[in-house]
Amino acid sequence: MSLTTLCREKCREKKEQMSKTTFLIGCTHFGHDKMYKFVDYNGKKIRPFENAKEGDAVMLERWNSVVGVDDKVYVLGDVAFTSESLSILKKCNGKKILIQGNHDNLSVSEYMKYFKDIRSSHKLDGEILSHIPIHPNSLWRQKKNTNWLNIHAHLHNQTVSLAQADPDTEQGSIADMERIHGIEPKKDPRYFSVCVERIGYKPISIDGIRNLTNPKSVV
């Protein structure tokens, strides 16, 4: 192979890599009918669909409307409760990596049918991916004098609030009272939830998240 051909090949590979997008999504709970019966503090259903069949169909359609076959998708846990429900991932575009959640209790071999890798957490350029939100004391980046952004799932339609992260308050009490009275608590900018209830039931790109967040702006 000539030097010119080699350079062209490297440029082509670089362009292909740049054209691929990284997406994130969490807490799909495919096939989990009980999820569609849960209600919030105000008695409103957490998910606006009748059952898992309807919800799964919507999530599949929306997933493939934004994710291409060569895109990367980090799934931040609680994918499905059964092997049968997990098989919907065959129809979901993208090369998938699982950040394991507390309800992902099937065998590793089951998950490896659909995922390229399984991890407990993962770091990107400025972001830590986890299922459960990481303790705020672990988000400070001393060398860079800034915070990690924790992209997480687990909380469904709720978010990590500044009240919950403040050690001088009773944990969660202020945020809970605000929610009971229909007030959205002030979000902690060090956290971003990719639970389907928070992102329109479809994966969101990492660039989209970065455009919406500023983990430096913290108390």
Regions found by a protein language model. Name each.
Residues 2-76, 80-219:
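Extended recognition/assembly regions associated with phosphoester-bond processing machinery
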